[in-house]
């Protein structure tokens, strides 16, 4: 951190801008106050919620001026890290009951930098992932083309809804589905 803040002025400027964007949400006093535990509102015991089979809802929207995305990403990573610790400490060597991380609007709300590694390694530990993105391009823009392809490769079930206009992606999905032969039967009655 010292090097990033005291090095080349271009690097320092980039570092400061990145930090400001990540912490912009906390520049709003009411939001900052909600993130501080108090006697009336104690901190959530994440391990206890997971052990009881509870549910976490992280709700937010993308705002270019005060995005909740960095906070939601950090919190989602913390929840998943806690689940991993619990899975490794479990007498069964996995979470029982399992945990489903349902990541809707993944690129906008909580683009987890560790998602590919987690998908590859943590399914066997009782931590499953279901993620959704509006478009392939949105996923590639946030994660990069190679990382998005790696996520795509680790995905067991692919659901594509209508409305996609990405010709290349649609062709790729069509190629994955393969050729389908459909038998048709027709009858003629001999009349015109």
Over which residues does each language-model region extend?
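Conserved beta-strand segments of the P-loop GTPase G domain that flank and frequently precede/overlap
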Residues: 58-59, 102, 132-134, 160-162
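Sensor-1/coupling segment of RecA-like P-loop NTPase cores
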Residues: 122-142
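P-loop NTPase motor core of the ASCE superfamily
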Residues: 45, 53-54, 117-120, 138-192
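A generic structural motif
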Residues: 86-93, 131-134, 184-191
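P-loop NTPase motor domains
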Residues: 1-127
């Amino acid at each position: 951190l010292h090097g990033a803040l005291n090095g080349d002025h271009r690097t320092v400027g980039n570092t400061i801008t990145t930090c400001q964007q990540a912490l912009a949400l906390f520049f709003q006093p009411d939001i900052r106050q909600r993130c501080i535990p108090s006697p009336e509102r104690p901190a959530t015991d994440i391990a206890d919620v997971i052990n009881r089979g509870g549910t976490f809802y992280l709700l937010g929207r993308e705002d270019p001026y005060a995005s909740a995305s960095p906070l939601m990403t950090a919190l989602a990573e913390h929840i998943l890290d806690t689940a991993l610790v619990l899975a490794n400490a479990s007498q069964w060597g996995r979470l029982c009951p399992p945990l489903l991380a349902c990541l809707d609007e993944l690129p906008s709300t909580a683009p987890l930098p560790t998602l590919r590694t987690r998908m590859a390694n943590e399914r066997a530990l009782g931590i499953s992932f279901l993620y959704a993105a509006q478009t392939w391009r949105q996923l590639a823009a946030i994660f990069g083309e190679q990382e998005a392809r790696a996520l795509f490769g680790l995905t067991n079930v692919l659901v594509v809804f209508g409305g996609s206009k990405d010709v290349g992606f649609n062709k790729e999905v069509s190629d994955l589905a393969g050729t389908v032969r459909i038998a048709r039967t027709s009858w003629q009655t001999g009349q015109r």
